[in-house]
């Protein structure tokens, strides 16, 4: 068990205690070098593992193979964690003691409060902030992909309109064609967020489903969250998915991919598009059941009830990497204020 933080410790040791706790939450077994056994569980995190560049703060093993390193820093280092990325890379490229050298693809820098992550297999690797460390099975999957990462696949998605047809010939409106092409360009540039702004009645949901179809078709088996703020919006989205037929396939979207409105306290296996209210997602992240009437309450009324931001902790059954893409319908009502932490 991880020892509680004691505040007379050195600040970096305090950070390591928090990191230990977060690793354990994510399914890692913590070990010292003295008791090193990389086959003890699927995911093993070894403290102070020796390399020819000095001990690395944590070396992470998946199924007995080294896959990641963590460079730990004290909490007040959070705003300048990017300055230690070179140090992390040096440790990852160093010769490891006791075992044959392996290519370390995954790098973390963490204060325990702020954590940054780099996948060196990406086409243009760069660090990004993450909520927690990834689970062992996640790193195992990503390691098996090698250079064929999600971001590599996003860059390789073919053009929607290589023959420069009119939008009508593609079964789209001009604004829909522009939105889909711009979204694809944004994802290819590795921009993590994008905003689609369209007039009322312009077909935003149809546009979103068109983008989802292309993401699922060209990036493989993925999970998409379609987040709404009312039950009615979720049901409307489901109905549009039921009748949506892509221009390059005669089958309906829901014949190709499993899309469901989430109505239970868990997400069923095999669902590729999860349609969910932000209220239910909050209950899923809390690991709690919710009363159905609560889901029909408008966000504004929830905010009047709650008054302060909703706390969200790590949920092992629904880790941050569970979804590959998140679409937020009517996002101006949910991405700020009390619901921001849920996202």
Briefly describe each language-model feature range.
Residues 231, 253-264, 278-283:
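Conserved helicase motor
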Residues 1-223, 228-248, 269-273, 279, ...:
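ATP-dependent helicase/translocase motor core
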Residues 29-34, 249-259, 332:
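Short, well-structured beta-strand/strand-turn elements
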Residues 277, 329-330:
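Walker B catalytic acidic pair
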Residues 335-343:
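Post-DEXD/H (motif II) to motif III coupling segment of the RecA-like Helicase ATP-binding lobe
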Residues 220, 330-334:
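Hydrophobic transmembrane alpha-helical segments of multi-pass transport and channel proteins
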């Amino acid at each position: 068990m991880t020892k509680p933080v004691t505040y007379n410790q050195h600040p970096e040791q305090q950070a390591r205690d928090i990191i230990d706790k977060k690793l354990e939450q994510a399914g890692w077994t913590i070990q010292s070098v003295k008791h090193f056994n990389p086959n003890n569980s699927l995911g093993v995190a070894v403290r102070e593992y020796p390399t020819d560049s000095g001990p690395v703060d944590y070396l992470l093993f998946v199924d007995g193979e080294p896959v990641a390193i963590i460079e730990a820093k004290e909490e007040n280092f959070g705003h300048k964690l990017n300055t230690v990325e070179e140090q992390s890379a040096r440790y990852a490229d160093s010769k490891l003691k006791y075992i044959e050298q392996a290519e370390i693809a995954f790098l973390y820098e963490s204060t325990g409060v702020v954590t940054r992550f780099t996948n060196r297999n990406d086409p243009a690797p760069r660090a990004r902030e993450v909520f927690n460390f990834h689970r062992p099975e996640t790193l195992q999957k990503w390691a098996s992909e090698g250079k064929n990462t999600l971001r590599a696949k996003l860059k390789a998605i073919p053009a929607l309109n290589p023959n420069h047809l009119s939008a009508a010939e593609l079964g789209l409106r001009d604004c829909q064609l522009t939105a889909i092409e711009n979204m694809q360009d944004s994802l290819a540039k590795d921009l993590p967020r994008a905003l689609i702004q369209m007039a009322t009645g312009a077909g935003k949901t149809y546009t979103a489903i068109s983008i989802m179809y292309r993401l699922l078709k060209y990036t493989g088996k993925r999970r998409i969250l379609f987040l709404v703020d009312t039950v009615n919006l979720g049901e409307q989205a489901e109905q549009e998915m039921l009748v949506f037929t892509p221009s390059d396939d005669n089958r309906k979207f829901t014949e190709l991919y499993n899309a469901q409105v989430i109505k239970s306290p868990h997400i069923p296996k095999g669902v590729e598009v999860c349609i969910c209210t932000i209220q239910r997602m909050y209950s899923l992240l809390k690991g709690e059941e919710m009363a159905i009437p609560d889901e029909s309450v408008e966000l504004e009324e929830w905010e009047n009830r709650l008054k302060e931001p909703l706390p969200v902790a790590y949920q092992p059954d629904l880790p941050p990497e569970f979804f590959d893409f998140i679409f937020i319908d009517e996002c101006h009502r949910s991405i700020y204020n009390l619901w921001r932490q849920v996202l």
